Amino acid sequence: MRYANRIACCVSLLFFCLLVGPATQSPVCAQTAAAAQVPAVQPVAPANISVRASENAIDESVASDPSVEAVIAPYSAKVKELNAPIGRLVGGLKKGGMGGGSLGNFVADALRSRAEVVLKKPVLLAVINSSGLRKNQIAEGDISSSDIYELLPFENALVTLELSGEQLRRFLNLTVEHRNAQSGARIVYRTNKELKKSELVNVKLRDAGGAEIEIDPAATYTIVTIDYLVKRGGDYSVLQEGKNLRPLSLTMRDAVLEYVKAETAAGRPIKAMLDGRFRYDRTAQAQESEEEQP
């Protein structure tokens, strides 16, 4: 639209200059007239093109080209490997709701489990952004590497860092606000009608023995998350306030793949469910599970 207006303006100026004549041209008219002296584009006759087509069916009777087969062979092998079953999924997984649903629980649990293997000690909490889960569901049955690649297409890496109890509560409030997935906490939240967003009401962690513990604002807690959230800044700048940031040299995708393979090797099927790690607070009413949240 900008260029159309500019052309219309130039044409109007040129027409005005032609009317008033060369003797009375203003500098603008003279410039416009000079600019208008552009060689005209000569029309070109359309070329005559003759096309001849024939149908040639290609089926099993046509031998494969060895040179083409040699090029695609490595890729075919990789695709076959990606589609091969690496575990058995019970119940299926679905994304949605607070915490990314059962799919979010599955990924967060997997990251926490593999982080414990790398660190060789219990991990209190793992948090990831549910928006990074790019597959809405995985059906019950065989689960393959390609399912995990589709679910986690990004190269987000696991990191561990230390937060004070006060910083951790702020981070978990963001976790609720953004409906992110987590493993290790029991969270109660509510809707702030004035701000039109979810907010943290109460949270408890589990110690190495499985007992629930309150967050001490003055204590230090080691958590696992992903580099994307640490680098993001903005609301997540609380993570940049943490200490002893350490990369685990493991991507989210590889962590989940390793988790599935390890569970399968141990004879355990892959499963995750809505287990009440997020509970909605209805004020005077009893707290309800995430299946019943609005």
Describe each model-derived feature in a short phrase:
Residues V62-V90:
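N-terminal, Lys/Arg- and Ser/Thr-rich interaction peptides
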Residues V20, I86, V90-G91, M98, ...:
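Feature targets compositionally biased, intrinsically disordered low-complexity regions
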Residues M1-R6:
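N-terminal secretory signal peptides that target proteins for export/translocation
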Residues C10-P22:
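Bacterial N-terminal signal peptides
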Residues S12, T24, A70, E288-E292:
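Disulfide-bonded cysteine motifs in exported proteins
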Residues K80-M98, Y236-G242:
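Acidic/histidine-rich, surface-exposed loop or edge segments in extracytoplasmic proteins
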Residues G21-A35:
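Signal peptide processing junction and immediate N-terminal pro/mature segment
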Residues T32-E60, G101, N105-P294:
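Feature captures C-terminal
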